[in-house]
Amino acid sequence: MITWEPWRAPPGEPRIAEQPDVALARIADGAFDDLVERWARDVAAYRGPVLIRLMHEMNGFWYPWGDAANGNSPEDFVRAWRRVHRIFARAGADNVSWVW
């Protein structure tokens, strides 16, 4: 299972929730599509079963994708999740099961 956590944490630095460069609206608007598309193609090429847990615990304040960080809203979460899911579907990554 892959736990996909959209944040930036340089080695040796603490992980903090306030990271506006990875706000959900940016994901939903396509700022990271190149990265997501690359992952989707690689997962589709793998062909074995893959479980992806995308942006878990979204209702907490402790993650950059949480609804209390970076100006995120529940609507932003839904838009970002759907965008990532659509990209995987377009890539033919039908070997993915999405974990809630």
What is each of the regions a protein language model found here?
Residues M1-W100:
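Substrate-binding cleft of extracellular glycoside hydrolase catalytic domains
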